[in-house]
Curated annotation (Swiss-Prot):
Quaternary structure note: Multimeric (with different ratios of monomers).
Compartments, record wording: Cytoplasm
Organism: Saara hardwickii (Indian spiny-tailed lizard)
Protein name: Alcohol dehydrogenase 1A
Keyword Endoplasmic reticulum: no
Length: 375
């Protein structure tokens, strides 16, 4: 077997920003105590991976990107009890240590052991398990799935149903859960309410699905790419608007569409500061809630009129849909297996891992929702 040995395998490496990923052979060290080595079988391409490549989301390079995935445990380090070799698993970019303030709180889900904000690009012990040509490679947000094998901390992996199709449930590792949870878990959308979703990519469409599941009576999709509208309507949007079709700001358009009231809930699923303030301004001045779901660029700051908040609006962020990862991912996989929701409409392309750069080109061109790479 491979347990306890260095594994040589294929990975896509980001050596520098604004360059295609490079598929090369890397060495993956065995897991240390409380770590798990996973054979990745399916991984989705998410806009957040592209934000690192573009330089918008600052991370230390070289790095093995990818964070939306599913696979099988190859081996475990000393002291690991939550999974065993052969288990089907999903790596978690939001860990759940069970001990920190966020994990202990019923209201929190962003475990403080996450590497989203610190951006060290390393394992919790401050080292890497990846090398290429004698050079150490960084890990990406506790996961790194653009590789045949990865190593994660035991707080960043969870066992799922052995019968689950990994090429579909990999989306529960990020895109689906992030959007769906923003509606049902973070916003707690109420039946009969009106929602607006800004950005109709994979996460935005999942937010649309969440609004529908929560019983929203109107779900307005907002995107400057009208090619996204048919799919949004298929997923539950009752109408779609393109801000480029109007002379007035989109928040005024949404007020007009709601009889001057504004929407009950708005979701910004793009990651732009201008659309974040527009989404806030689109919701009801008193009890409206706006959720920031899109990953904001590292360097950006936001300016807005405090009057927007003073009247009673709520502005809230949501990471991984507000779900506590270890508690929720297995349950979401079970719900999928029980056909409580479908992931098929989100997966527009399936391709071999070697075509990863083509997958990113489809994303940038607005031609895909989710591309799933198979090893």
């Amino acid at each position: 077997g491979t347990a306890g040995k260095v594994i040589k395998c294929k990975a896509a490496i980001a050596w520098e920003i604004k360059k295609p990923l490079s598929i090369e052979q890397i060495e993956v060290a065995p897991p240390k105590a409380h770590e798990v080595r996973i054979k990745i079988l399916a991984t989705g391409i998410c806009r957040s991976d592209d934000h690192v490549i573009s330089g918008a989301f600052k991370m230390p390079l070289p790095m093995v990107l990818g964070h939306e995935a599913a696979g099988v445990v190859e081996s475990v380090g000393e002291g690991v009890t939550c999974v065993k070799p052969g288990d089907k698993v999903i790596p978690l970019f939001v860990p759940q240590c069970g001990k920190c303030s966020s994990c202990r709180s019923t209201r929190g889900n962003l475990c403080t052991s996450n590497d989203l904000s610190a951006a060290t690009g390393l394992m919790p012990d401050g080292t890497s398990r990846f090398t290429c040509k004698g050079k150490s490679l960084h890990h990406f947000i506790s996961t790194s799935s653009f590789t045949e094998y990865t190593v994660v901390h035991e707080n960043s992996v969870v066992k799922i149903d052995a019968a689950a199709p990994l090429e579909k449930v990999c989306l529960i590792g990020c895109g689906f859960s992030t959007g769906y949870g923003a509606a049902v878990e973070t916003a707690k959308v109420e039946p009969g309410s009106t929602c607006a979703v800004f950005g109709l990519g994979g996460v935005g469409l999942s937010a649309v699905m969440g609004c529908k599941a929560a019983g929203a009576s109107r779900i307005i999709g907002v995107d400057i790419n009208k090619d996204k509208f048919p799919k949004a309507k298929e997923m539950g949007a009752t109408e779609c608007v393109n801000p480029l079709d109007y002379k007035k700001p989109i928040n005024e358009v949404l007020f007009d569409l709601t009889g001057g009231e504004g929407v009950d809930y708005s979701f910004e699923v793009i990651g732009r500061t201008d659309t974040m303030t527009a989404a806030l301004a689109s919701c009801h001045m008193d009890y409206g809630t706006s959720i920031i779901v899109g990953l904001p660029p590292s360097a950006s700051e936001i300016t807005f009129s405090p009057g927007l908040i003073f009247t009673g609006r709520t502005w809230k962020g949501s990471v991984f849909g507000g779900w506590k990862s270890k508690d929720s991912v297995p349950r979401l996989v079970s719900d999928f297996m029980q056909k409580k929701f479908s992931l098929d409409p989100l997966i527009t392309h399936t391709m071999p891992f070697d075509k990863i750069n083509e997958g990113f080109e489809l994303l940038r061109a607005g031609k895909s929702i989710r591309s799933v790479l198979l090893f």
